[in-house]
Amino acid sequence: PGILVVDQHIAHERVLYDRFKKSSENKKIEVQQLLFPLTMEYSPSEVELLVRHKGSLSELGLELELFGKNEFLLRTVPAILKNNDKEEIMREIVDMLPAQKHEEALHEKFEEILIMMSCRNAIKVNMSLNLDQIRKLISDLQETEMPYTCPHGRPIALLYDIDSILKKFLRK
């Protein structure tokens, strides 16, 4: 017996990552169409990267359309992005894209992109959760492939045994 302390942000990150990865592998990513496409300007080298990886980005739910010489319209995003700053996330993604379309490098970078998007969309550490939300998070976490670590490898929960706790209170 003891007390299990769960980091809600890391736990939710694992849940989102597993869902997103599974959806990505099944090519069934839930997307959100933007009511007003986001116009973003890029450097010529970034435009080249985006054109090269447009199909792969589409598989992640990011629908881009070249608009003029150095601009893209972002038409859809993965539904898990919710209200996050889509332009900032796109900038991070562009920075992560490999220079070549080498399959192994692309797979590795997309793994990093999935992790980043999951992290950005996870419940924040200081956010209060009610009992139902806590139960749902723990239930969802138990259904993941690796419920003990986040995609970065950090532990999700720590178990403090009762004897250690009692010693802290000078009871043993």
What does each of the following model-derived ranges do?
Residues P1-K172:
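Long, charged low-complexity intrinsically disordered regions
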